[in-house]
Regions:
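Aromatic- and acid-rich polysaccharide-binding/catalytic face
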Residues: 1-6
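Generic structural signal for well-ordered alpha-helices
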Residues: 9-20, 100, 124-128, 226
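A structural motif corresponding to the C-terminal end of an alpha-helix
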Residues: 15-28, 99-109, 232
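Glycan-binding loop/region signatures in secreted carbohydrate-active enzymes
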Residues: 27-101, 128-135
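Conserved, mostly hydrophobic/aromatic
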Residues: 30, 103, 111, 214, ...
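C-terminal/domain-terminus segments
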Residues: 99-138
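N-terminal pre-catalytic segment of deacetylase/amide-hydrolase enzymes
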Residues: 134-211, 218-223, 231
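Short, well-structured secondary-structure segments
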Residues: 210-211, 226-246
Length: 246
């Protein structure tokens, strides 16, 4: 498919209107798309992303997020190291707040999240609350202006040697709220939240194996292993840890 919103608000509303002509809204549970998608000019690289992975990509590429006031989805573009152009679309807590406001006014039977673990954690500030017009004044949206750094780990590249690039830091967001409709009409990521970001190094070429020998060196077996490696011209390196490195 072509790059585009994960869950456009108007598309959602149209689909709910359509199904509600056949099924009572009281029996409809609306699925919330809490993830993103990274489209590349190289289609083999197209992949789904979590909220935090999308934010990390935007931060790494110094991209500016665009919050579309028509779809309520976010997007940005960047180029990878091979000069492929990527277009990323994803949802966050503001997107899902607006969708849940719609669901509560319809009213639908409820909502479900797709998928747990990929969501913007700020949604838990309001997910289990009544977001109907009669109750919305009681909902404090101030917590949505701060995004806590995540303890999950985002890995970059491949290999067994790890380099920590970033640790969790909180982000700051400015919101614009329509007081009449009680929805979020715009948001600006002033600073991006970060998670643990780890660069992997040492990826082996195709059809190449890396053998590891644990619990050494051993005075009997290590020389035998080295003799076999030498005979077959296999390069080797020692990583000494624990007591053996002292």
């Amino acid at each position: 498919s072509d790059p585009g919103p994960i869950a456009s608000q108007k598309w959602i509303e149209a689909q709910v209107d359509k199904i509600s002509k056949k099924v009572s809204p009281s029996k409809v549970i609306l699925g919330l798309g809490a993830y993103g998608y990274d489209w590349s000019s190289n289609p083999d690289q197209n992949t789904s992303v979590t909220y935090m992975q999308a934010i990390t990509k935007a931060n790494q590429s110094k991209a500016k997020l665009d919050f579309d006031d028509n779809t309520f989805n976010l997007s940005f573009s960047y180029k990878d190291l091979k000069n492929n152009v990527h277009n990323v679309f994803f949802t966050d807590a503001a997107t899902l707040f607006n969708t849940m406001r719609f669901a509560s006014e319809y009213p639908l039977a409820g909502t479900a999240l797709w998928r747990l673990g990929s969501e913007d954690a700020r949604i838990w500030n309001y997910y289990n609350k009544d977001l109907s017009a009669a109750n919305i004044a009681k909902i404090n949206l101030k917590p949505l202006e701060n995004v806590k750094g995540q303890t999950m780990v985002d890995y970059i590249g491949d290999g067994e040697v790890l380099d920590v690039l970033n640790t969790p830091k909180s982000g700051k967001i400015a919101l614009e709220i329509d007081k009449n409709e009680n929805i979020i009409t715009d948001e600006n990521y002033i600073t991006y939240p970060t998670s643990y970001e780890v660069q992997k190094h040492g990826e082996a070429p195709a059809k190449e194996l890396v053998l590891t020998f644990d619990d050494g060196p051993d005075e009997t077996y290590t020389p035998q292993v080295l003799d076999v490696l030498s005979k077959h011209h296999v390069p080797a390196v020692f990583f000494l840890i624990g007591l053996n490195s002292e």
